[in-house]
Amino acid sequence: MTRNRESATPPRRAGAPRLRPVRESPVQPVSREPHAHNNHEPPHDRSQAILEAAKRVGALLKGSGHTFALAGSVAVYAHGGSGHLRHDADFCVRRADAEAVAATLTEAGLTVRTPPEDWLLKTTCFDQEVDLLFELGHRPVTSDMLARAQDLPVDSVHMPVLAATDLMRALIEPFSEHHCDFGPVLAAARALREKVDWEDVRRSCGDRPMPAAFFFLLERLNVIAPRKEPR
């Protein structure tokens, strides 16, 4: 999940889970039975590999009863968007659940890493990066946000997927002078246009320059209706 990094990483918040980073080490043979995520070769197609990683991690979180939601380009795909997936697979979890989520993935044989940024954890599945996000668009992941998630099929696996309005807000809010790649988000907006409460998204970030420019572009391309000015 792309996030605006124009400022330095903020200090760790009070009460944030203290997960120790995992040190990199050479791969060594192990004697235990292989875990399910290693039973098959990773797909050669990058988009399919990202999709398989999302399905695997989603199935692990769902099977362990965690509260979460799929986000990012795989969530756009689940809502009917393009199957051309970008960068990685993203999941939203509450900060308070980070330790338990990390334990579940570690038990399944995945290595969970703590990057310098304090708003996510990272792991790798089928050679693809998977981000576990505590914040979306500078907003904390909340119980209400996760409660709005929809249970949708991601290929053969059903899982909670971020609601279309929350998903578009998370894609648009980070736009700034240093992060303004409208292309992929425009494609997502076209795919999700009928599912999104656009006025809700506008109220969240439409007064800031780059999100406002994106809304103007959506209007000119007839993706959304022009905003009605009060009389």
Where are these regions (language model features)?
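Compositionally biased terminal segments of proteins
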Residues: 2-6, 11-13, 17-231
